[in-house]
């Protein structure tokens, strides 16, 4: 176990955890659903944080050595390798601050590890000052939700196309089966069952 502290005091963090004290507080305070974040949302968080790190390096705000390690950490998040490091309950109050801080801590601790430094060495790479540089929760969470929705939309489009194909096949299968049509809750002219699809 390693020890991390915040304004409320000190907590022990499991040695294998990339998350830190803010995530532990969220786990203590928000045990509501028993679920964790959707993997696609975690991926979107990694993408948004990677874009921020790249932009901050490009404009000279973020040291390249630290920034490149953070980008590599974001790539690990995007790939799904670190999904188990996001234990925060989806229902956690506020505007997603716990998700944002969970992500910041994972990025920092993975980047610290990449650079050969111990996890929790926030004087070197800080969740607030480095991983959250030029951002706020109100930037990160809505943007990540939109990115996640776009990725989900791709899956939805494929599913809807498959559904339309199924309807076409059923329409063809039942094109010769007659039935009574209905309109205004009354029987109407005969139609084929295939036309229902």
Segments predicted by a language model, with ranges:
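Conserved, well-structured ligand/cofactor-binding cores
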Residues: 1-197
